[in-house]
């Protein structure tokens, strides 16, 4: 199992007027600096963790590799990889001074961004995993924007815990190309797709199951004059 690398794509974000880091798939980043962590998600998920008292936070970006196992089996290689991606983020935050019992989570992604992805079900598996993992670890999810058909651009302020999300076009070229590659990687070594869980029908705007509260997620990159856009601070 390979290590999860620290994101190194540093830049100055003109939209948020602060330094930022762009996370690619299978990267993570933690900091207590007043900066922004940004990533673009298709079927992958990003977990944003924050210690509101320590004012430290971090983000990861990962997907479960498909080993053909039953996704409900805790011992499968996929689950071990997902757990590792989460443990790296949690442990790095603790090493930097965060307290596990204070961590709050905001989770994003898990979309079906290609026509065939609802059959492959990668996004659903990623979304289900991150919810289940955080529940087992007793880390409260304070906001989520998971599943559906739209890629997402996510911005997270680790110093304050504020998160913002922007829905992208369903067939955003860069995301679609990346997701097509991920779909190919979901084919087993013998060239046939491994057995999947039950197929699902994507409904536009499907609500997250058993939401604990209204998601405190702000939409960014939208015109303020649009009456249908409701902004909420995360």
Swiss-Prot record:
- State the Gene Ontology terms under molecular function: protein-glutamine glutaminase activity
Q: Which GO biological-process labels does this protein carry? A: chemotaxis
Keyword Hydrolase, does the record have it? yes
Alphabetized SUPFAM superfamilies for the sequence: CNF1/YfiH-like putative cysteine hydrolases
Which UniProt keyword terms apply here? Chemotaxis, Hydrolase
Reaction(s) catalyzed by this protein? L-glutaminyl-[protein] + H2O = L-glutamyl-[protein] + NH4(+)
Q: Which InterPro entries match?
A: CheD-like_sf, Chemorcpt_Glu_NH3ase_CheD, Cytotoxic_necrot_fac-like_cat
Pfam families assigned to the protein according to its UniProt record, in alphabetical order: CheD
Q: Check the record and name the Gene3D superfamilies matching this protein.
A: 3.30.1330.200
User: Per its UniProt entry, what is the enzyme's top EC class, as one word?
Assistant: hydrolase
Q: What is its EC number?
A: 3.5.1.44
Task: Kindly give the NCBIfam families that the UniProt entry links to this protein.
Answer: PRK13487.1, PRK13489.1
> Which HAMAP family has this protein been placed in?
CheD
Purpose: Probably deamidates glutamine residues to glutamate on methyl-accepting chemotaxis receptors (MCPs), playing an important role in chemotaxis.
Question: Which family does the similarity line name?
Answer: Belongs to the CheD family.
Specify the protein name.
Probable chemoreceptor glutamine deamidase CheD
Q: Which organism encodes this protein?
A: Burkholderia mallei (strain ATCC 23344)
Q: What is the lineage of its organism?
A: Bacteria, Pseudomonadati, Pseudomonadota, Betaproteobacteria, Burkholderiales
Gene of origin? cheD
